[in-house]
């Protein structure tokens, strides 16, 4: 069976609350790091989430 192209990543909140989302991205097509605006339930606001590696 072939190895998958998608890689698991963690999106960490830039608000400093240590809240994160997990998702996957195509590592062959998207070489730059993801930055998405998502809801942070700790501060109850939409903030920027930046990509980090899952350890």
From Swiss-Prot:
Gene3D superfamilies: Ribosomal protein L33 (2.20.28.120). Keywords: Ribonucleoprotein, Ribosomal protein. GO terms for cellular component: cytosolic large ribosomal subunit. GO terms for molecular function: structural constituent of ribosome. GO terms for biological process: translation. It comes from the Bacteria. It holds the Pfam family Ribosomal_L33. Belongs to the bacterial ribosomal protein bL33 family. NCBIfam families: PRK00595.1, rpmG_bact. This is Large ribosomal subunit protein bL33. The lineage of its organism: Bacteria, Pseudomonadati, Pseudomonadota, Gammaproteobacteria, Candidatus Palibaumannia. The gene is rpmG.
